[in-house]
Amino acid sequence: MNKRKCTVESTDYEVEFPMTVSATVRCPIELRKLNLNKDTRSSLIKLILEHGDEQNHSSNVKADMTDWFMHTRYKEFKELSIFTEALSKKISKDNIDVMTFDCWGAVYRKGEETIKHTHWGNLWSWCYYLKVPIDSPPFRFEDIGGGEAGKTASFDIYPQEDDLLMF
């Protein structure tokens, strides 16, 4: 088993990996190593870099971001989407149809961020980490509940290369 750093408010924890955080944080969170082959990862990186910032920082992602529908144009994105669809069915334990609506890539540089937002209307969302510099900020879940006296808390996950984070 690997361990990953997670932070709740200002307290750091080392947690076993892969992990699933239960619905006590309003939605399940699944973090696991994908073990995607190096050629596919290299191809995904190349495609994302070639597309550059097609959104002009106009979405919640204030960094270079491709178009929303890369899975409809490139087999590498489609394969990644198919895997996450299968995993979401397994995690849900319900016989529900899932489909990828949008799938895109982003490149963050120092000082860039994604602003706080929700994924209302989506049962599952996910991030796949192709490269993660050592000083990268965590993925933060805001207002997860479960804080002291009914207060909300934040929950930070520090992904590593080849991690898949589903929520």
Each language-model region and where it sits:
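Non-heme Fe(II)/2-oxoglutarate
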Residues: 2-95, 113
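Catalytic core of non-heme Fe(II) oxygenases with the double-stranded beta-helix
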Residues: 98-167
